[in-house]
Design a protein with these regions (language model features):
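Ordered hydrophobic segments in well-structured contexts
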Residues: 1, 8-10
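Surface-exposed interaction regions that form or flank ligand-binding interfaces
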Residues: 3-5, 17-19, 31-131
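Active-site ExK catalytic segment of metal-dependent nucleases
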Residues: 10-17
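Polar interaction faces of repeat-based domains
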Residues: 20-24
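Hydrophobic, well-structured mid-protein blocks that either form specific transmembrane helices
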Residues: 25-29
Length: 131
């Protein structure tokens, strides 16, 4: 998770190697390895949204309503991601790879409502207590 003046960002990091395909609304995605072996795994975009919603709810209950966003990072070198969005939703969970990880930094630092300093301090205290 990343915490900055734009709120909290939950980052689901995956270390899969190969090509990831599917649709962002699918329950499972397909991973095709370089050997041709295929396996399915739970859609990390859905997984991270559940985590982000849980964190946002916990923060709101603690009296610190804070924007919480989520994203997915496939960190393994050479992993390619080919995901579609058949429903053309406006609020799609962003998916980043090692190659475009610098866009992830921009997403964390520049997307979302700017928090006041006291909100950031309160958020930090709550998160430290959650450890």
């Amino acid at each position: 998770m990343a915490l900055c003046r734009r709120g909290a960002t939950v980052i689901e990091v995956k270390n899969h190697a190969g090509t990831v395909t599917g649709d962002l609304s699918d329950h499972d995605l397909l991973l095709t390895r370089k050997t041709g072996a295929e396996l399915t795994f739970y859609n990390p975009a859905m997984q991270v949204m559940t985590h982000a919603q849980t964190l946002a709810r916990a923060l709101a209950e603690a009296g610190v309503p804070c924007p919480v966003k989520g994203c997915v990072l496939f960190i393994r070198e050479g992993t390619s991601v080919r995901l579609s969005d058949r429903f053309h939703r406006r609020r799609v969970t962003p998916v980043f790879t090692r190659r475009n990880r610098f866009r992830l930094r921009w997403y964390i630092l520049h997307r979302g409502k700017r928090l006041r300093r006291r909100e950031v301090r309160a958020l930090r205290r709550i998160l430290e207590d959650m450890k």
